[in-house]
């Protein structure tokens, strides 16, 4: 009887472990806003800083210049910075280079350098196979030229 109880306990723990793993993998904390995926890491990073990243991105994808500028100027650190770069790359594809250029034309050299770094990270480490491993000047030549200091 003791052995049966022990086997049932182990079986229950294994099942619970499998269920938890599957549940966590299926219910990741990422979100999709107007076709752009925002990673859980980026959501947590911005939420902890009181930034409504989804709202800013939602408005930016509709072409709002102020929201585009606000999104581009966010300072995102560590791993979330790579994800932010991926979001920027996807945003450029949705709204087009002209809207991005209008948003950045009033920025200073330091800001432009920061944006360049995010975009390059998004191109190198992003999850979009159409732009992965491409150079900024090849995929977005007009944005590249407007980001030069």
What do the PLM-derived regions correspond to, one by one?
Residues 6, 19, 70:
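Functionally constrained cores in energy, signaling, and assembly domains
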Residues 1-13:
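N-terminal Sec-pathway targeting helices
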Residues 14-24:
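Hydrophobic alpha-helical membrane-insertion segments, chiefly the h-region
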Residues 25-149:
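Non-catalytic all-alpha helical scaffold/repeat segments
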């Amino acid at each position: 009887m003791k052995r049966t109880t022990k086997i049932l306990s182990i079986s229950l723990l294994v099942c619970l472990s499998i269920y938890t793993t599957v549940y966590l993998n299926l219910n990741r904390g990422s979100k999709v806003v107007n076709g752009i995926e925002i990673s859980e890491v980026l959501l947590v990073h911005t939420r902890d800083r009181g930034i409504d990243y989804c709202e800013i991105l939602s408005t930016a994808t509709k072409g709002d210049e102020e929201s585009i500028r606000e999104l581009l100027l966010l300072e995102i650190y560590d791993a979330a910075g790579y994800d932010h770069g991926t979001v920027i790359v996807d945003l450029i594809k949705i709204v087009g280079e002209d809207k991005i250029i209008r948003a950045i034309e009033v920025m200073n050299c330091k800001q432009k350098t920061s944006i360049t770094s995010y975009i390059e990270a998004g191109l190198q480490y992003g999850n979009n196979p159409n732009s992965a491993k491409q150079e900024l000047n090849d995929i977005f030549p007009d944005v590249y030229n407007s980001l030069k200091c």
